[in-house]
Amino acid sequence: MFYPDPFDVIIIGGGHAGTEAAMAAARMGQQTLLLTHNIDTLGQMSCNPAIGGIGKGHLVKEVDALGGLMAKAIDQAGIQFRILNASKGPAVRATRAQADRVRYRQAVRTALENQPNLMIFQQAVEDLIVENDRVVGAVTQMGLKFRAKAVVLTVGTFLDGKIHIGLDNYSGGRAGDPPSIPLSRRLRELPLRVGRLKTGTPPRIDARTIDFSVLAQQHGDNPMPVFSFMGNASLHPQQVPCYITHTNEKTHDVIRSNLDRSPMYAGVIEGVGPRYCPSIEDKVMRFADRNQHQIFLEPEGLTSNEIYPNGISTSLPFDVQMQIVRSMQGMENAKIVRPGYAIEYDFFDPRDLKPTLESKFIQGLFFAGQINGTTGYEEAAAQGLLAGLNAARLSADKEGWAPARSQAYLGVLVDDLCTLGTKEPYRMFTSRAEYRLMLREDNADLRLTEIGRELGLVDDERWARFNEKLENIERERQRLKSTWVTPSAEAAAEVNAHLTAPLSREASGEDLLRRPEMTYEKLTTLTPFAPALTDEQAAEQVEIQVKYEGYIARQQDEIEKQLRNENTLLPATLDYRQISGLSNEVIAKLNDHKPASIGQASRISGVTPAAISILLVWLKKQGMLRRSA
């Protein structure tokens, strides 16, 4: 039977991608249905109890700038906050928070259940309704059919998921959850390229069986960082430390002597694992010269006894896992409460997607999260928001939107996936972005909130706060530009005391702030330039904008040059065999990838600058050289 009411957008899956997709579509006023196999696991942290990190924290800030959920949820659930790379430049600084799993899940569920235009329904999805190459609905395991104008697939590791512990394996979406086998079979019937990937998780340890007294502590930062541009530290619950232990030669001997029982090394697992989050087996074999690896013991919550040992993800048999755990300092008597495991799952080639994350072959069908070959909560959340907003726009007969590489890490992520694809689980790093000085955590709202408002993602409260911040920045910069001190002035001695070289000429507040030894905090304690802004976010922006003004201007020039290529469009139906002068390799790659623009084409491996020049000349001769607005 059909459900009596139609929907504009259906989201299948309630993980980090699905919850952001559902919230985005509903915020934009579209009637949205979130289908999940279990309402109690909405927003579940399936692996590590943490949000953020290098590159990942940038994505969380961007999701937040567009009105998303993740940053607000972690501000309510974070039990340790730190700024990584704090001693480095602002482009690579990143926020990371340890999470209380239960609080995080509760924060997500509360937000979903209180979001207008959003309905949640508990049933696993087994089929899609596709008519004339357009998706028009979904079918649940009990045969209930839902109609919609757009469907977003955010199914994580559930598609034909297979869990491995040693040489034993069984079907599962993650530990304790069934896989989605009928939906996997249905998707394999569609004209989509499919592959297998693998990820893993470590065993969880009973905190009562660890001797923390012999371990080094790692505390959070004080003052505590905040993730959301709308948040403040008063939202954070009690803060707790993490602990550090290490593997040793005994640990490594245990692993090496049991590799024949590893499903990965025995050839049982076909899927490719994440390069930047390898299993402990991989680390020991790939870095054979290392006699130890650092392991972080991370609490899973304020009311939980479970400890997440970050760094020993494994699919070795349980008896070997026990030996590994007990070989480390402080863990000699440790007890495992959940075994580690690896999981294999289906993913679909993201090169078959438009930058909006809509399928090129099935109209109205969007993909987000691990189904696209990514790994990580943050990457999933960012894709979910993008897919959700574009599903909402499609259902309202509006054009899709995707950020450029120069606008957001989300733009880098989507362009990498849709242009290059991936053969291993993709994770975000700041090194993937060409314009990372422009794409900082601190200015995510300045880059994206106005766009979010135009798209209908940003509410009145966030918009008012954003405009107030803009006004504070502009007003303070004008004040510092127009406040001067001369070498002969009475205040000069006070100023000179904070400078490595005394004033030799008249200087404005901005002139002084450009000096490497001067900070905004220090400057605004000096008589001519007091008082400081009480808006800490605006104050941070003032300092960064002034200190890095020259570098930012140069990078902006580079972006404008690159935009000419990004905006030069390539016809979707173009057969590159008709263009003389291109090599067979280039023709094959262009016909395979079908890039949307000259910029995309230039990033495909093997497509040379000479080939790009030939393309541009051919387009001009054919009268097909056109640029997007």
From Swiss-Prot:
Coiled-coil regions listed: none
Amino acids binding NAD(+): 273-287
Pfam families: GIDA, GIDA_C_1st, SAM_GIDA_C
First and last residue of the signal peptide: none
Oligomeric form and interacting partners: Homodimer. Heterotetramer of two MnmE and two MnmG subunits.
GO cellular component, one term: cytosol
Role: NAD-binding protein involved in the addition of a carboxymethylaminomethyl (cmnm) group at the wobble position (U34) of certain tRNAs, forming tRNA-cmnm(5)s(2)U34.
Cofactor entry: FAD
Any one GO BP annotation for this protein: tRNA wobble uridine modification
Organism: Shigella flexneri
HAMAP family: MnmG_GidA
InterPro entries found in the cross-reference section: FAD/NAD-bd_sf, GIDA_C_N, MnmG, MnmG-rel, MnmG-rel_CS, MnmG_C, MnmG_C_subdom, MnmG_C_subdom_sf
Transmembrane segments: none
Highest taxon of the lineage: Bacteria
An example molecular function term from Gene Ontology annotations: flavin adenine dinucleotide binding
Subcellular localization: Cytoplasm
Entry protein name: tRNA uridine 5-carboxymethylaminomethyl modification enzyme MnmG
Family, per entry: Belongs to the MnmG family.
Keywords for the protein's UniProt record, in alphabetical order: Cytoplasm, FAD, Flavoprotein, NAD, tRNA processing
Binding, FAD: G13, G14, G15, H16, A17, G18, V125, S180, Q370
Record lineage: Bacteria, Pseudomonadati, Pseudomonadota, Gammaproteobacteria, Enterobacterales
Keyword Nucleus: no
